Amino acid sequence: LLFAAAPAFGQDIFVMGEVHDNPAHHSVQAKRVADLRPAALVFEMLTPEQAKRISPGQLEDRDALANLLEWDESGWPDFGFYHSIMTAAPQARIYGAGVPREAARSVGDNGLAAVFGAGAEDYGLTQPLDEAEQAAREALQAKAHCDALPAAILPMMVDVQRLRDAALARKARTAMIETGGPVAVITGNGHARRDWGMPALLAMAAPDLDIHVLGQGEDDRPPEGSFDEIVYSPAPVRPDPCDAFR
């Protein structure tokens, strides 16, 4: 593992990015969480409803907890990756910031701000992105989906990404208020990026919070976007993700 900067633990909110299927990235997160001893853990991978099912005594039985959360139907990688992070801070209250699929699907019909609900303006959701950022985000969505998506749906894909960013920011803010912090946020690199992801929206809504952002690269490739710190780990052997679109 190569570290681009020394870890920092004086923050209110520590955002920890990942490539979801990279085991080394989750090992880094678990180590950082153990060192940080956060009062709260916020997961992109859990909806608020799922997080409410978890009580501290349930962390010991990984398989039972996975069944309780219906993890196998969630589409996320091996639950063990995230269970190791939960057990690294057994004292932490667990929050879910994931946007339910039904809500994400409704963005195209109902609009970004309406789906988010109260406080949308605080997180910039009532304003359009500037043209350059909108174009850059649409290009990233196209690339992430192997240029297989119709161009007409790319704006909605960007709106869903913004919705997920804002949901993460809102939940981190709530966790900070309810627990006093520190708060660790576990999410993908795309949501963790400081320039336009969850940290940017959180800083907009709660400028007094001190935020540190960790991005995780693979081999010598940094993640897209800007971060306070980048850690590099080997990329796992994986099939070509574009095979699914062929």
List where the protein language model places each region:
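Zymogen propeptides
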Residues: F9-R37
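Generic beta-sheet signal
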Residues: D12-F14, A39, G181-T187
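Solvent-exposed loop/turn segments at secondary-structure junctions
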Residues: V19-N22, L46-Q50, P100-A104, N189-R193, ...
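Membrane-embedded segments
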Residues: V28, P48-S55
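Short internal beta-strands
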Residues: A40-L46, H212-Q216
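A substrate-binding/cap region within the structured catalytic cores of diverse enzymes
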Residues: I54-A175
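C-terminal regions of proteins
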Residues: A167-M176, A184, H191-R246
